[in-house]
């Protein structure tokens, strides 16, 4: 970011000027999207095709708004393949290793010429064959490097058998030259592999590594862009020389987690003069603020949940544009591919349990502790009577035949998570427990939500945040139970 701040305006590319708001993004007109594409994936729906056409036609920046379950990554795979048909070179990034590996796994069956940057220990086993580290050992160019390595090893072994000092000195000299040759050939091998790859994938941070120095790309694609800090997104932009940026994400889910004490403080953007900018303001957010729907297309069909579960987030957050696919709109727990009894829980998609008036009072975890005593959970909140109700409902699901590994219990508070863990972890082996924030991006057949808050002041705290409620309501396929 220091480099970016010091860069004079005269050096800004067209894309940079658009991202800073110094120039307006060129609006895509219907005629720009008139080209009929030869779709490689016949399963795409109309909104996915529209988003791909829009991204291809956009000259500088395009946002693909993909709510959970709408096939955002599925859409990106087709977009990448369409870009390759146009002979474009792509740098594909995400804020985490798992977000990048997910794309690599989806691209792999299509024999895309790609390389994944990153340490092998941090990558999923299924993507290792595409990692730069493995390719440098298995490619044709790697064979020459291996030959030099073998020769070095042989020279090292011969030293131990040589007693003559002059001969040992000569061998050391040969090894020194071999090491120099080895480093040069290894660097050439690595550089060649990256240079010849039409698709390079890395985390946003990893895109700033030396492997991409002097490499040029036509397009940067960032998946999970609404989970990435804006500063992270500038790393591939500055290293790639790309003229187009495609961001995919959902700004109506939780933003990246910021632990800085002044993260909420509002500052003015030094480049654009815009106010209301803080660390939680993502590049996706800022582009929407600058250009609105002119740079965005939304995926409108979700393939995850029953239409009744879909109703609240669609109406409250997605302008009633989000619809359930025919294949899932009436799907219930009783329809699972194993034997499940028909009960009140397995024949309904949404169940609310009202604990009002039942003395289900919340408590702060340090209420009963001296202020000087440190608490493992800080000042998080819990509600033990509500946790007991949750246990009862989980038991009813299991008794009906739902497998524990298909059930998740989520709660917004770590204090309640600790209480639930004590009650459920050993009794229901395989059940998944997590915070609402931590469970984002995952899904289960049935989710029980423990909301915790119950007080005379009717305060709900950060549960008033719509994006947090959205994350809570979009993790389940067949049933959600809220306590």
Protein language model features and the residues they cover:
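Conserved helicase motor core of SF1/SF2 NTP-dependent helicases
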Residues: 86, 96, 205-483
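ATP-hydrolysis module of ASCE/P-loop NTPase motor domains
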Residues: 133-176, 239, 243, 473
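A short local structural element in Rossmann-fold oxidoreductases
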Residues: 2-6, 104, 310, 421
């Amino acid at each position: 970011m220091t480099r970016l701040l010091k860069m004079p305006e005269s050096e800004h590319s067209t894309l940079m000027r658009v991202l800073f708001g110094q120039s307006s993004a060129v609006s895509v007109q219907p005629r720009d999207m008139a080209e009929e594409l030869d779709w490689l994936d016949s399963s795409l729906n109309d909104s996915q095709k529209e988003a791909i056409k829009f991204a291809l036609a956009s000259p500088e920046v395009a946002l693909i708004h993909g709510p959970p379950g709408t096939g955002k990554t599925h859409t990106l795979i087709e977009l990448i393949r369409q870009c390759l048909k146009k002979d474009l070179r792509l740098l594909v990034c995400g804020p985490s290793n798992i977000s990048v590996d997910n794309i690599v796994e989806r691209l792999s069956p299509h024999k895309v010429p790609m390389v994944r940057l990153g340490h092998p220990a941090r990558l999923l086993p299924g993507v290792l064959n595409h990692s730069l580290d493995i390719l440098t050992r298995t490619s044709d160019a790697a064979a020459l490097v291996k030959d030099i390595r073998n020769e070095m090893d042989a020279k090292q072994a011969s030293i131990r058998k040589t007693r003559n000092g002059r001969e040992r000195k000569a061998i050391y000299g040969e090894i020194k030259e071999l090491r120099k040759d080895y480093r040069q050939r290894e660097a050439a091998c690595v550089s060649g592999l990256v240079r010849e790859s039409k698709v390079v994938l890395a985390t946003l941070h990893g895109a700033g590594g030396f492997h991409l120095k002097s490499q040029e790309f036509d397009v940067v694609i960032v998946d999970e862009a609404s989970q990435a800090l804006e500063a992270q997104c500038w790393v591939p932009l500055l290293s790639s020389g790309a003229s187009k940026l495609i961001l995919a994400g959902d700004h109506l889910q939780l933003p990246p987690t910021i632990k800085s004490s002044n993260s909420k403080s509002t500052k003015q953007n030094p480049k654009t003069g815009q106010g209301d900018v803080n660390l939680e303001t993502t590049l996706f957010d800022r582009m929407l603020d600058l250009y609105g729907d002119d740079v965005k297309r939304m995926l409108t069909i979700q393939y995850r949940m029953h239409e009744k579960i879909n109703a609240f987030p669609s109406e409250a957050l997605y302008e009633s544009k989000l619809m359930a696919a025919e294949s899932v709109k009436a799907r219930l727990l009783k329809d699972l591919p194993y034997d499940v009894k028909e009960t009140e829980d397995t024949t309904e998609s949404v169940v609310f349990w009202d604990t009002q008036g039942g003395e289900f009072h919340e408590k702060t975890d340090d209420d009963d502790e001296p202020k000087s005593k440190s608490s493992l959970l800080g000042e998080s909140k819990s509600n033990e009577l509500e946790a007991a109700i949750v246990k009862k409902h989980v038991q009813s699901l299991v008794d009906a035949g739902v497998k524990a590994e298909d059930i998740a219990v989520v709660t917004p508070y770590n204090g309640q998570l600790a209480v639930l863990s004590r009650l459920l972890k050993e009794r229901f082996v395989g059940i998944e427990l997590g915070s609402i924030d931590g469970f984002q991006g995952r899904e289960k057949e049935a989710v029980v939500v423990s909301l915790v808050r119950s007080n005379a002041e009717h305060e709900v705290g950060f549960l008033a945040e719509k994006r947090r409620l959205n994350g809570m309501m979009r993790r389940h396929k067949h049933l959600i139970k809220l306590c």
